[in-house]
């Protein structure tokens, strides 16, 4: 008896305050983000095209349908969260994809977060104007 492959693969991606939950199913390459078509959700955002980079690097573009739920953050953070989520889900499809994705940085979670505002300052680092006299 052959081992049954799961029909759905899951990956989570995070960037800044955005969290993306990605579900991949074998299909014809349809990508749905929060119930909308990918192009409609990210209309005109050039950075969003990079979210699909993992599909291009592994040669799986058009082979999987993706259902993505993303919340928090802005468009750029959400696009990068989706990018990481797709890459992690593709690793579950085939662990050999790691060799193609790792050198491109697709499996690295970007650790940069917003620095907190400190008391006595106007912003995180911006100090009030200084006057000698």
UniProtKB/Swiss-Prot annotation:
<dbReference type="InterPro" id="IPR014721">
    <property type="entry name" value="Ribsml_uS5_D2-typ_fold_subgr"/>
</dbReference>
<dbReference type="InterPro" id="IPR023035">
    <property type="entry name" value="Ribosomal_uS9_bac/plastid"/>
</dbReference>
<feature type="compositionally biased region" description="Basic residues">
    <location>
        <begin position="119"/>
        <end position="133"/>
    </location>
</feature>
<dbReference type="GO" id="GO:0003735">
    <property type="term" value="F:structural constituent of ribosome"/>
</dbReference>
<feature type="compositionally biased region" description="Basic and acidic residues">
    <location>
        <begin position="107"/>
        <end position="118"/>
    </location>
</feature>
<dbReference type="InterPro" id="IPR000754">
    <property type="entry name" value="Ribosomal_uS9"/>
</dbReference>
<feature type="region of interest" description="Disordered">
    <location>
        <begin position="102"/>
        <end position="133"/>
    </location>
</feature>
<dbReference type="InterPro" id="IPR020568">
    <property type="entry name" value="Ribosomal_Su5_D2-typ_SF"/>
</dbReference>
<dbReference type="GO" id="GO:0006412">
    <property type="term" value="P:translation"/>
</dbReference>
<keyword id="KW-0687">Ribonucleoprotein</keyword>
<protein>
    <recommendedName>
        <fullName>Small ribosomal subunit protein uS9</fullName>
    </recommendedName>
</protein>
<keyword id="KW-0689">Ribosomal protein</keyword>
<comment type="similarity">
    <text>Belongs to the universal ribosomal protein uS9 family.</text>
</comment>
<dbReference type="GO" id="GO:0022627">
    <property type="term" value="C:cytosolic small ribosomal subunit"/>
</dbReference>
<dbReference type="GO" id="GO:0003723">
    <property type="term" value="F:RNA binding"/>
</dbReference>
<dbReference type="Pfam" id="PF00380">
    <property type="entry name" value="Ribosomal_S9"/>
</dbReference>
<dbReference type="InterPro" id="IPR020574">
    <property type="entry name" value="Ribosomal_uS9_CS"/>
</dbReference>
